[in-house]
Protein backbone atom coordinates (compact mmCIF):
# COMPACT_ATOMS: atom_id res chain seq x y z
CA UNK A 1 0.00 0.00 0.00
CA UNK A 2 1.10 3.54 -0.65
CA UNK A 3 1.95 5.78 2.27
CA UNK A 4 -0.48 8.48 3.28
CA UNK A 5 1.58 11.66 3.13
CA UNK A 6 -0.94 14.21 4.29
CA UNK A 7 -3.01 13.80 7.41
CA UNK A 8 -4.52 16.37 9.70
CA UNK A 9 -4.56 15.75 13.44
CA UNK A 10 -7.28 17.56 15.35
CA UNK A 11 -9.29 17.26 18.54
CA UNK A 12 -12.10 14.78 18.25
CA UNK A 13 -15.65 16.09 17.97
CA UNK A 14 -18.88 14.53 19.14
CA UNK A 15 -19.73 13.46 15.59
CA UNK A 16 -16.47 11.44 15.47
CA UNK A 17 -17.49 9.17 18.36
CA UNK A 18 -19.08 6.50 16.14
CA UNK A 19 -16.02 6.21 13.91
CA UNK A 20 -13.70 6.10 16.92
CA UNK A 21 -15.73 3.34 18.57
CA UNK A 22 -15.76 1.39 15.30
CA UNK A 23 -11.94 1.56 15.19
CA UNK A 24 -11.73 0.52 18.86
CA UNK A 25 -13.93 -2.49 18.08
CA UNK A 26 -12.01 -3.52 14.97
CA UNK A 27 -9.80 -6.25 16.43
CA UNK A 28 -10.33 -9.43 18.46
CA UNK A 29 -9.86 -7.69 21.82
CA UNK A 30 -11.92 -4.63 21.01
CA UNK A 31 -14.77 -6.56 19.45
CA UNK A 32 -15.39 -8.17 22.83
CA UNK A 33 -15.27 -4.86 24.73
CA UNK A 34 -17.15 -2.41 22.53
CA UNK A 35 -20.83 -2.24 21.59
CA UNK A 36 -21.37 -1.23 17.98
CA UNK A 37 -25.10 -0.63 18.00
CA UNK A 38 -27.38 1.77 16.20
CA UNK A 39 -27.85 4.03 18.01
CA UNK A 40 -24.53 3.95 19.79
CA UNK A 41 -24.91 3.48 23.56
CA UNK A 42 -25.14 6.78 25.44
CA UNK A 43 -22.19 5.77 27.65
CA UNK A 44 -19.80 6.61 24.79
CA UNK A 45 -21.19 10.13 24.48
CA UNK A 46 -21.09 10.67 28.25
CA UNK A 47 -17.43 9.61 28.26
CA UNK A 48 -16.74 11.92 25.33
CA UNK A 49 -18.26 14.87 27.23
CA UNK A 50 -15.88 14.22 30.14
CA UNK A 51 -12.88 13.89 27.81
CA UNK A 52 -13.82 17.01 25.89
CA UNK A 53 -13.76 19.13 29.05
CA UNK A 54 -10.70 17.60 30.74
CA UNK A 55 -7.79 20.00 30.40
CA UNK A 56 -5.16 17.27 30.83
CA UNK A 57 -6.60 14.90 28.20
CA UNK A 58 -6.64 15.23 24.42
CA UNK A 59 -8.67 12.80 22.33
CA UNK A 60 -7.53 13.40 18.77
CA UNK A 61 -8.30 11.99 15.35
CA UNK A 62 -6.31 11.81 12.14
CA UNK A 63 -8.08 12.82 8.95
CA UNK A 64 -7.01 11.96 5.43
CA UNK A 65 -6.98 14.45 2.55
CA UNK A 66 -10.73 13.95 2.06
CA UNK A 67 -11.56 14.68 5.71
CA UNK A 68 -12.30 11.05 6.60
CA UNK A 69 -11.30 9.99 10.12
CA UNK A 70 -8.66 7.26 9.72
CA UNK A 71 -6.99 7.14 13.13
CA UNK A 72 -7.23 8.22 16.74
CA UNK A 73 -5.46 8.30 20.07
CA UNK A 74 -5.83 9.72 23.53
CA UNK A 75 -3.03 11.62 25.26
CA UNK A 76 -3.21 12.20 29.01
CA UNK A 77 -0.73 14.46 30.80
CA UNK A 78 -0.28 13.16 34.33
CA UNK A 79 1.52 15.23 36.95
CA UNK A 80 3.31 13.27 39.64
CA UNK A 81 5.79 13.40 42.47
CA UNK A 82 8.03 10.60 41.21
CA UNK A 83 11.01 11.39 39.01
CA UNK A 84 11.45 14.70 40.83
CA UNK A 85 7.92 15.88 40.19
CA UNK A 86 7.93 15.09 36.49
CA UNK A 87 4.78 15.01 34.42
CA UNK A 88 4.38 12.06 32.09
CA UNK A 89 2.38 11.60 28.95
CA UNK A 90 0.20 8.52 28.71
CA UNK A 91 -0.78 7.48 25.20
CA UNK A 92 -3.89 5.31 24.99
CA UNK A 93 -6.32 3.89 22.46
CA UNK A 94 -4.13 4.25 19.39
CA UNK A 95 -6.12 2.98 16.43
CA UNK A 96 -5.87 3.20 12.65
CA UNK A 97 -8.68 2.29 10.26
CA UNK A 98 -8.10 -1.16 8.77
CA UNK A 99 -7.82 0.10 5.19
CA UNK A 100 -5.13 2.62 6.23
CA UNK A 101 -2.82 0.39 8.26
CA UNK A 102 0.84 0.09 7.25
CA UNK A 103 0.69 3.48 5.53
CA UNK A 104 2.35 5.67 8.16
CA UNK A 105 -0.79 6.93 9.91
CA UNK A 106 -0.03 5.31 13.26
CA UNK A 107 3.53 6.56 13.20
CA UNK A 108 2.40 10.12 12.49
CA UNK A 109 -0.18 10.25 15.26
CA UNK A 110 2.15 8.69 17.83
CA UNK A 111 4.91 11.13 16.84
CA UNK A 112 2.39 13.95 17.24
CA UNK A 113 1.53 12.71 20.76
CA UNK A 114 5.20 12.48 21.75
CA UNK A 115 5.85 16.02 20.50
CA UNK A 116 2.72 17.31 22.25
CA UNK A 117 3.72 15.66 25.54
CA UNK A 118 7.20 17.16 25.27
CA UNK A 119 5.72 20.60 24.52
CA UNK A 120 3.55 20.28 27.65
CA UNK A 121 6.65 19.67 29.77
CA UNK A 122 6.45 15.90 30.17
CA UNK A 123 9.70 14.15 31.03
CA UNK A 124 8.60 10.88 29.43
CA UNK A 125 5.82 9.23 27.50
CA UNK A 126 4.37 5.84 28.34
CA UNK A 127 1.85 3.57 26.70
CA UNK A 128 0.39 0.16 27.28
CA UNK A 129 -0.31 -2.49 24.70
CA UNK A 130 -1.94 -5.84 25.33
CA UNK A 131 0.55 -8.69 25.59
CA UNK A 132 -1.15 -10.46 22.67
CA UNK A 133 -0.59 -7.52 20.30
CA UNK A 134 2.85 -8.56 19.10
CA UNK A 135 2.67 -6.44 15.93
CA UNK A 136 1.83 -3.36 18.01
CA UNK A 137 4.78 -4.08 20.30
CA UNK A 138 7.11 -4.22 17.28
CA UNK A 139 5.60 -0.99 15.97
CA UNK A 140 6.20 0.87 19.23
CA UNK A 141 9.73 -0.53 19.55
CA UNK A 142 10.47 0.78 16.05
CA UNK A 143 9.39 4.23 17.28
CA UNK A 144 11.83 4.05 20.19
CA UNK A 145 9.59 2.78 22.99
CA UNK A 146 11.15 0.18 25.28
CA UNK A 147 9.47 -2.46 27.46
CA UNK A 148 9.80 -1.19 31.03
CA UNK A 149 6.88 -2.23 33.23
CA UNK A 150 4.47 -5.08 33.81
CA UNK A 151 0.89 -3.88 33.51
CA UNK A 152 -1.77 -5.23 35.82
CA UNK A 153 -5.54 -4.92 35.38
CA UNK A 154 -8.42 -5.32 37.81
CA UNK A 155 -11.80 -5.10 36.07
CA UNK A 156 -15.08 -4.28 37.82
Please tell me what each predicted stretch does.
Residues 49-61, 90:
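A short helix-loop-beta-strand connector motif used in the catalytic cores of GNAT acetyltransferases and
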Amino acid sequence: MAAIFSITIRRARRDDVGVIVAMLADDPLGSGRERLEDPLPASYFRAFEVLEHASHIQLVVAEDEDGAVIGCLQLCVLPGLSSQGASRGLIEDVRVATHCRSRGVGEKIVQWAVAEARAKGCALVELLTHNTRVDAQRFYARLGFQPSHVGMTLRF
